[in-house]
C-alpha cells in the first residue's frame, strides 16, 4: 500500500512537468500583399523555446534574450543565419532576401513567442509566390508550419512540413 501511495504522489508531481511544455510543434507565418501599397509583408511567430533549441540547443536558455533591452549581440545574426536556411520566399520568380526588421516577444512561460517581421516592395504586380518553410523540421519530426497568405481580397492557407516543404501560388 505504501508503494502504491508513493507511486501516486510521484505521478501527481510529474503532471505539472509534463503539462508545462507547449504541446504544439508549429509555427505561424502570415504573408500579406497589397497591390495598392506594392509591398509584401512577412510575419513569423515562433515559440521562443523552439528558437533557443534550434540556435543554442537549450530551450530554456536566456543567453540570447531576444527582443529584450539586453539582447545578446549574437542573437540577431544567429537567428538570421537560421532563418535563411529554413525559410525562403519567391515573388514572381525572384528570391526575396530574408531580413529581420522587427522582433517582439509575446505570451509568457512555455507559451512565449518571438514574432519576427520584415517587408519588401515589389516593382511588378504579384503574379506568383513560392513559400518554403521548414522551420524546426530538423528538430521535431511532427513540426507543422502554418502559412496564411493574403493578397488583396484573396486568402490562402497551407500547412508546410518536412514532407511538404514548399508551396507555389499563382494569382
Residue ranges, per PLM feature:
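Intrinsic disorder/low-complexity segments
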Residues: 11-14, 163
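Bacterial N-terminal signal peptides that target proteins for export
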Residues: 1-11
Amino acid at each position: 500500500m505504501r508503494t502504491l501511495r508513493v507511486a501516486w504522489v510521484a505521478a501527481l508531481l510529474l503532471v505539472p512537468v509534463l503539462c508545462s511544455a507547449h504541446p504544439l510543434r508549429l509555427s505561424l507565418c502570415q504573408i500579406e500583399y497589397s497591390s495598392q501599397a506594392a509591398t509584401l509583408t512577412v510575419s513569423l511567430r515562433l515559440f521562443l523555446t523552439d528558437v533557443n533549441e534550434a540556435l543554442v540547443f537549450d530551450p530554456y536558455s536566456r543567453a540570447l534574450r531576444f527582443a529584450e533591452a539586453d539582447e545578446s549581440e549574437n542573437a540577431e545574426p544567429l537567428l538570421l543565419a537560421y532563418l535563411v536556411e529554413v525559410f525562403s520566399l519567391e515573388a514572381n520568380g525572384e528570391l526575396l532576401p530574408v531580413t529581420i526588421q522587427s522582433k517582439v516577444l509575446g505570451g509568457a512561460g512555455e507559451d512565449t513567442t518571438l514574432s519576427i517581421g520584415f517587408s519588401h516592395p515589389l516593382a511588378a504586380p504579384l503574379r506568383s509566390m513560392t513559400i518554403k518553410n521548414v522551420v524546426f523540421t530538423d528538430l521535431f519530426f511532427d513540426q507543422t508550419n502554418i502559412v496564411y497568405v493574403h493578397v488583396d481580397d484573396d486568402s490562402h492557407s497551407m500547412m508546410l512540413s518536412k514532407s511538404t516543404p514548399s508551396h507555389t501560388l499563382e494569382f
